[in-house]
């Protein structure tokens, strides 16, 4: 396989990660400290503390406005958040493939979730769900138009759900690629290259934040759609 490292969209080729095992190596090296046992049997291990604290913070942020009806879905939404967040962060490793930058994956996750919560809503309260298509106080002559508009808005939810995640990650990776190319091009001028490298460093930190925020937004929107149907 011929790899074109100068291609701006070459990083989004799915088969790159299969030929470069450094991605998994870096992950295992960074997480190897979790396997170190604690000398005391009375205290929780590092892995238990990390998982527990992360789980509590995720639940606190994601589900602080969750109503009791959506409580059975908390574990599923937490798993979805961890899955998307892990894929986003691992995609920042060198030559790694960010699968969430492809709408084929984001729609494969978002559309079934959207369909499941809406089918559940129509199954539990069919008349109430139909009533949402006509806002309260709508004049009678506007009801047909409002039904069409609300129906289009309803079916636009899964499109926006998957497209938002893929578009933001793609834009962030393209910016990182362009800046790294600029650093290499301007390497003959140390002063300009150092400034560009500093900008690249802060942009990389911002991209880590975007990876977390996009996982949160995706999960929060699915949780919001569920709360509308219960």
Swiss-Prot record:
It is found in: Mitochondrion inner membrane. One of its GO terms (cellular component) is proton-transporting ATP synthase complex. It comes from the Eukaryota. InterPro entries: ATP_synth_F0_asu (IPR000568), ATP_synth_F0_asu_AS (IPR023011), ATP_synth_F0_asu_bact/mt (IPR045083), F0_ATP_A_sf (IPR035908). Keywords: ATP synthesis, CF(0), Hydrogen ion transport, Ion transport, Membrane, Mitochondrion, Mitochondrion inner membrane, Transmembrane, Transmembrane helix, Transport. The keyword Mitochondrion applies. It is a multi-pass membrane protein. Pfam families: ATP-synt_A (PF00119). Signal peptide: none annotated. GO terms for molecular function: proton-transporting ATP synthase activity, rotational mechanism. The chain crosses the membrane at residues 16-36, 73-93, 106-126, 142-162, 165-185, 192-212. F-type ATPases have 2 components, CF(1) - the catalytic core - and CF(0) - the membrane proton channel. CF(1) has five subunits: alpha(3), beta(3), gamma(1), delta(1), epsilon(1). CF(0) has three main subunits: a, b and c. NCBIfam families: ATP_synt_6_or_A (TIGR01131). Mitochondrial membrane ATP synthase (F(1)F(0) ATP synthase or Complex V) produces ATP from ADP in the presence of a proton gradient across the membrane which is generated by electron transport complexes of the respiratory chain. F-type ATPases consist of two structural domains, F(1) - containing the extramembraneous catalytic core and F(0) - containing the membrane proton channel, linked together by a central stalk and a peripheral stalk. During catalysis, ATP synthesis in the catalytic domain of F(1) is coupled via a rotary mechanism of the central stalk subunits to proton translocation. Belongs to the ATPase A chain family. This is ATP synthase subunit a. It comes from Patiria pectinifera (Starfish). The gene is ATP6.
């Amino acid at each position: 396989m011929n790899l074109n490292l100068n291609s701006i969209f070459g990083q989004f080729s799915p088969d790159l990660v299969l030929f470069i095992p450094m991605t998994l190596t870096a992950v295992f090296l960074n997480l190897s400290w979790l396997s170190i046992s604690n000398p005391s049997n009375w205290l929780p291990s590092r892995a238990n503390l990390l998982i527990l604290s992360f789980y509590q913070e995720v639940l606190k942020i994601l589900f602080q406005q969750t109503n009791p009806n959506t409580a059975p879905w908390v574990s599923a939404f937490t798993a979805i958040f961890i899955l998307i967040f892990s894929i986003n962060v691992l995609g920042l490793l060198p030559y790694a493939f960010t699968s969430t930058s492809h709408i084929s994956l984001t729609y494969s996750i978002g559309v079934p979730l959207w369909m499941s919560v809406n089918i559940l809503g129509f199954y539990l309260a069919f008349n109430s769900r139909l009533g949402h298509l006509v806002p309260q106080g709508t004049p009678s002559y506007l009801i047909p138009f409002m039904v069409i508009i609300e129906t289009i808005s309803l079916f636009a939810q899964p499109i926006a759900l998957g497209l938002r995640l893929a578009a933001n990650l793609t834009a962030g990776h393209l910016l990182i690629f362009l800046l790294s190319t600029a650093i290499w091009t301007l390497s003959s001028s140390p002063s300009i290259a150092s400034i560009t490298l500093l900008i690249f460093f802060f942009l990389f930190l911002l991209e880590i934040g975007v990876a977390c925020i996009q996982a949160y937004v995706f999960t929060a929107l699915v949780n919001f759609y569920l709360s509308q149907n219960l």
